[in-house]
């Protein structure tokens, strides 16, 4: 609201103004309201028997972050339980890419064919959130088998090498694909829970107009009110306490309330 007052001066009376650019940092409030005393969370991950050996080196629970909350190993105010499904190949095929060379006249003088393997695969993951009393809070789908994904192998000049690539390197490729899928799922979950329940750090860039003419009768008072705003508001960060801020801003608020009646 304070930022509207300088604009009111401009709209109703010709005034020399300076554009003052600033950045402010703050924490956004949760979109979904739950018990305001809840401030800790823990994460549990369960995989299938097929995927468990590959998940051991990934520690997906460490990737889940709820901004503004404290993470515990167990017994948090809310518990996030994640179920990771299998990474399943659904189709394998060999594709080719043909490269032609031409002479100066544009006549094709040669061709070279490169072969690569494409593997269509799917992945599924879900999360369920409850509080420590056992009350259900929300479910979230993190990955769906409806979304087909495609892995493309390196290219080879010999077709047989492309045809056997996934079979020979299935463990390495599957682990890398699973890692990518898990990372995306945990990132999606972190974004969703931070939006819904977190206190996210936000940086906003904006500007306001301040009186530039020393001849203006409000110059000194306006600048003083602006200095108060600058010291209190623009110096705050997401971890700052707002205790006492309203009292410190009261002189500036009173001033702007007064001048909007005059201009």
Please give the residue ranges for each predicted region.
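Generic marker of residues within folded, mature protein domains
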Residues: 1-3, 33, 72, 117
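Bacterial Sec-dependent N-terminal signal peptides
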Residues: 1-16
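Beta-strand elements of well-folded, non-transmembrane domains
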Residues: 28-30, 47-49, 86-88, 121-133, ...
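C-terminal/domain-edge helix-coil "capping" segments
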Residues: 12-21, 133-263
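Generic structural hydrophobic/aromatic packing signal, biased to beta-strands
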Residues: 41-43, 82, 127, 225, ...
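N-terminal segment of the mature soluble domain
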Residues: 12-92, 251-261
């Amino acid at each position: 609201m304070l930022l509207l007052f300088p604009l009111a001066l401009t709209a109703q009376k010709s005034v020399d103004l300076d554009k003052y650019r600033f950045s402010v940092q703050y924490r956004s409030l949760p979109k979904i309201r739950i018990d305001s005393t809840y401030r800790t969370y823990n994460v549990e991950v369960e995989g299938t028997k097929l995927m468990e050996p590959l998940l051991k080196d990934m520690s997906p629970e460490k990737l889940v972050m709820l901004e503004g909350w404290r993470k515990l190993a167990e017994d948090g105010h809310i518990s996030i339980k994640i179920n990771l499904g299998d990474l399943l190949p659904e189709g394998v095929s060999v594709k080719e890419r043909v490269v032609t060379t031409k002479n100066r006249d544009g006549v094709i003088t040669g061709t070279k064919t490169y072969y690569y393997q494409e593997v269509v695969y799917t992945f599924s993951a879900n999360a369920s959130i409850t509080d420590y009393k056992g009350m259900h809070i929300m479910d979230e789908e993190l990955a769906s088998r409806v979304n087909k994904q495609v892995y493309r192998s390196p290219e080879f000049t010999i077709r047989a090498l492309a045809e056997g690539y996934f079979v020979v390197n299935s463990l390495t490729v599957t682990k890398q694909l699973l890692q990518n899928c898990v990372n995306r799922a945990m990132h999606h979950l972190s974004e969703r829970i931070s939006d819904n329940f977190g206190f996210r750090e936000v940086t906003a860039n904006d500007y306001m107009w301040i009186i530039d003419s020393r001849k203006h009768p409000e110059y000194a008072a306006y600048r003083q009110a602006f200095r108060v705003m600058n010291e209190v508001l623009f110096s705050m960060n997401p971890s700052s306490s707002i205790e006492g801020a309203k009292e410190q801003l009261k002189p500036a608020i009173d001033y702007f309330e007064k001048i909007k009646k005059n201009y």
